[in-house]
Amino acid sequence: MYSNSKAGEQWGYIPPPGDVGDKFMSIEPLSWGRGSTPQGAGLQTETSGTPGGQQWSAPARSANLESIRAALTTDDSLGVVITGGRGVGKSSLARAAVADLGPDTWSLQLRSGPSGANTPYGCLSFLLARLPQAYMGSPTAILRGITSLIRSDAAGRPCVITLDTSGSIDDMSAGVLLNVLLTGTAKIIAVAPKISDLPPDFHWLLTDRRLTEVRLSNLNELQTRQVLLSLLGHRVSASLVATYHHTVGGNPLLLKALVTEQKLSGNLVLSDSVWTLRDKVVLDGAASLDDIVRSRWSRETPETREVIEMLSCARRVELGRLTALYSADVVADMEDAGLLEIDDSDHRWVSLREKYIGEVVRSWLSIARRRELRSGLLGGTEPEPAEMAVDELMAFAAWTHECEAELSPALALAAAEAAVQLFDPHFALSYADMLKRTDREWVPAQRHKAAAYLQLNLPVQALSALDDISQPELDSVGVEEYAHVVAAKAQVMLWLPEQAGKIPALLAAAKERLDAATGHATWPHRAVAAAHRVALSGFEYRAFAGDYADMIPELEAAADPALNPDTSYRMQASVILMSALSMTGREMDALSLMRRIGGQISDASHVVGLREQFTREAFVVLLTAGQWRRCIDLVGQRPDGEPDRMPYRSAASELAAGLAYVFSGRGGAALDPLISAMAQLELQPAQSALRSAYAATALAYAQTGNGTQARKYLGKLQRTPGKASFSAEKIIEFCALVAGRWLGDAEAVAGLKQSAERHMRAGIYTMAGISLLAATVNGSDADFRLLEDIAGHRQGPLAEVSRLIALGSRTKDAKTLLAAGELAATLELDAVEARCMALAVDFARQDGDAVSARTAQARLDILAATVANLPIMPSSGSPLLTARERQIARLAGRGASNRDIALEMGVSVRTVEGHLYQVFTKLGVTSRGDLTGLV
């Protein structure tokens, strides 16, 4: 069947794979005499592996490498075909596969360019040049000569040919390659964009499964991270991975070019052994990416180029509007070619699939061309800000700015607000500065400027922006804007210790003015809505100060739908109530309220910042309730469009994940996200986040037994000034004190007890219980009675764990501590469970309770493998099982005799008997049957 191709007709007869014998061309190496050249001359060979720099994308392609390796080492297989789009790493993968075979394999690289189909023996020309004249007389002789030459060069080693083609290869080369494959002279790794770019005979081989296709696509985000680790050689921040993946769409070639450009520009920096970004990615002037885009640009039609120009400037356009400007066929063809993507929303937004193309093309366009495109899309009318989504506003404002045109005051104000919502403070400041003092939008613009400064951790500048508003200007605005300005000022003053005490007077004055304006009006009257905003600021101030207990009745009234029809006020008050309940010992009530708010939050999507506020407070609620796994899930969620915000939000997400891990006792797992978060926060500080990162990292290192590093970060924490909300400050304090306790600092233990007493007096029972639980690893009876009393004011499984630990430790009851450990295990609090089991071992042995001692010791033995540094060791003198004792115990528990165990482990029977004696003593068992399930 292989004789159907043109290549087959050239040779007259090419047998099927099973019919290769005397009738076929000789595969014996010839003696070339004078016509030969030294081995390797003119050949592109790789016999000693590929330089690591050429295999930078290989770490993300391990599954593909395994498929290729299997195809090249299977007897029936003739090789593999690697297909995929431009830049996905086909050639890199082929080189990595060849290098993986090692020096015992002879490799030969062939290349065929776009014009290769028109040149006989095009990809074999350098082999053809080595043939003696006697073998140049006919295609058959050439085929025989090249086959034997390859066999001779391989010198008895397996041979792999890498055929890298960007287009079709000529029929003569195809025939020779087919002969080489079917005679077993070599196997092949063919690299092509599509199967159709290969000779027809290769299609038959694929159909018969003599060749295996490995189809490559762009990298997913996890693979992008693996490639970045390979390229950069150090940890990489989550924001770096997400931003780069979003920019290049997972294309490895573009990813490498982007890394090179960003390192040269200084935006990609190594901070404390973590690669991260200084600022947003800007591709203007990126030479290597520019070359890649120009190469692709040259192959597109003029109509396609114009659509690309439009989308480069506008970022996205509604499908109906785009097809009104350009041919629908052109748009459809571009979508089929993978240039465009169309979302599923009602607007059917169209954008460039590969964002880097828009960035680069936009940098080519002159101001005049940008204005021409903008005029064509707008048709002489500017859009209304109220009708635009946040992302749409940002795109339009950026386009207008790039055209060096003026934004209308209304659009500049809306863009500043959108930039704050998208955590882009620099753009927010630039848009707010466009407004003049004479514009009626100037006062609200100052609010957004203050919010942007707060995001940059510059509260002094934020307050200055608000203080610039004169009293006459403040008196001239409406009641709602007045309330927003007061709320913004109160928010800024929270972060300035010398100003925080003035907030009650500020809010009281605002309430007096609004009460006069309200009269007997009810919501939705503007004055009532304004009064609600000021009341909300009062709750925020009290929550920031930790005054939770006293304001719960007021919050419950504000959060009651029957009493409060104002959705915005009600939902935000509910979020504060959720935190207040959590801190005052009503953890289960807080979790119930959290679920209810989570189900209603979509109905309040118009409330700016509500989702972020809810996520932040829900994290603390879950953390203090011991639900650390749900904390990880919460911060791991990323809504659509998140990559645009990642430089400002990734650090917070990684910090939150690290905090969840250290609260669970998993210091080792916490270090990666915490170190990454610190690297970003040291470049872009965000309020109290850097102090939180230092404290959590110190605790993580202490939990893993690395006292030197723990003390280093405790020192950094002490040298870093700052102010935080009550909940954040208490988490920082808790992490620092517990780190000190792990390091054996008696003052840290005393600090935890004092903190617990202060919290208890203030009604903050949750933090009191958590602090005292950490302080009483070696507590007194009085400590345990207090811990038990505090647990009685709390709700939920973590409170019950505290109560059982206190009761079991005070009464020295092993069974109570076993119950506490089992409950801690349901929360996956390994360090707390280990504490329970260590105490249970001691108390059970003191009481002669062999069953409880055996159960606790077995569980402690398992935990020793996961808890790097146990919080407490049994004091009864019996250490944990050694690795060899554990191995012998497992074998004995499975029924193996002492002699069988000795033979398997290569030791004497006497040694086995001695180890088993130690195992029985430590675990309190008397027979081998008791070992089953314990070890």
Task: Briefly describe each language-model feature range.
Residues 79, 93-97, 329-330, 349-351, ...:
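Extended alpha-helical scaffolding segments used for macromolecular assembly and cargo binding
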Residues 54-69:
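N-terminal pre-P-loop "Q-motif" helix
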Residues 1-4, 10-53, 58, 79, ...:
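C-terminal non-catalytic interaction modules
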Residues 119, 305, 345-349, 387-394, ...:
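Alpha-solenoid helical repeat architecture
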Residues 86-88, 227, 231, 235-412, ...:
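Short secondary-structure boundary elements
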Residues 46, 57, 88, 92-159, ...:
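Conserved phosphate-binding/catalytic loops and adjacent sensor/switch elements of nucleotide-binding enzymes
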Residues 74, 132-137, 152-155, 187, ...:
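Helix-loop-helix "sensor" segment of P-loop NTPases
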Residues 103, 198-200, 205-207, 236, ...:
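Internal alpha-solenoid helical repeat scaffolds
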